[in-house]
Amino acid sequence: MTTPEYGSLRSDDDHWDIVSNVGYTALLVAGWRALHTTGPKPLVQDEYAKHFITASADPYLEGLLANPRTSEDGTAFPRLYGVQTRFFDDFFNCADEAGIRQAVIVAAGLDCRAYRLDWQPGTTVFEIDVPKVLEFKARVLSERGAVPKAHRVAVPADLRTDWPTPLTAAGFDPQRPSAWSVEGLLPYLTGDAQYALFARIDELCAPGSRVALGALGSRLDHEQLAALETAHPGVNMSGDVNFSALTYDDKTDPVEWLVEHGWAVDPVRSTLELQVGYGLTPPDVDVKIDSFMRSQYITAVRA
């Protein structure tokens, strides 16, 4: 296993809640979604995201929501995560319209698609994540009286363990087509863990199943991000989070793996290409961010 140059905050048996370690990244992304929702020309609406920030009482994120930035630099990460959210929203909407009635959100974090999207009747949305994250989300949404638009099933499990067993025990049927999202997760897994994740998903997918994978940063470089934040001061919206210390630099190529295992892979797109597809012109700061973070958004169908 290769660890980041700047030292890792990770260990093989580390654990987290919503305000620590990898769990905090889910809270941070929820903050960016909340900012995008209320910002200029939002691509998605996530009215629940702000409630997670309030419930967390995180002073940094509460400060961002209280005084949102409006410049192109200041809205960069909310904009880019809005693009990412729209990509996965569109993926599930297309799968749902095609008749797939099982959706699996891997490392669901504070994702609220079970509540936001207009699912067809009979659809079940399975959310896999560690217990403390799922418990926090359920508590906040319950306090807000949120009602899912599909049959939502929480699956408390660590992806480094035998998560397929609790998933199938929760009602997932591997004999029926399913749609899977792996959003923003891969940089936080070792190459071996990525390979194991792909293999387990593959084993659970009937013909016609679909998968979407993607992250804004398939490669995270601490020095380049710091240099960008110096040149574009408004970009620094991650507080003191050092993503390089939470991620791994050994990878399994997802496209290569999927093709070798019989999946039909659509053309890979970057966040910049997605923006153009959504009718936007990527600002210079977005181009610079993607030049070193190297976003990848992938969809594929099981033959």
Curated annotation (Swiss-Prot):
Keyword Membrane annotated: no
GO biological process: methylation
Gene3D superfamilies: Vaccinia Virus protein VP39
Residues binding S-adenosyl-L-methionine, per UniProt: D129, D158, L159
SUPFAM superfamilies: S-adenosyl-L-methionine-dependent methyltransferases (SSF53335)
Keywords: Methyltransferase, S-adenosyl-L-methionine, Transferase
EC number: 2.1.1.-
Keyword Transferase: yes
Pfam families registered for this protein in UniProt: LCM
Top-rank taxon: Bacteria
Gene Ontology molecular functions: methyltransferase activity
Family: Belongs to the UPF0677 family.
Protein's job: Exhibits S-adenosyl-L-methionine-dependent methyltransferase activity.
NCBIfam families: mthyl_TIGR00027
Alphabetical list of PANTHER family matching this protein: S-ADENOSYL-L-METHIONINE-DEPENDENT METHYLTRANSFERASE YKTD-RELATED, S-ADENOSYL-L-METHIONINE-DEPENDENT METHYLTRANSFERASES SUPERFAMILY PROTEIN
Full protein name: Putative S-adenosyl-L-methionine-dependent methyltransferase MRA_1908
Source organism: Mycobacterium tuberculosis (strain ATCC 25177 / H37Ra)
Origin organism lineage: Bacteria, Bacillati, Actinomycetota, Actinomycetes, Mycobacteriales
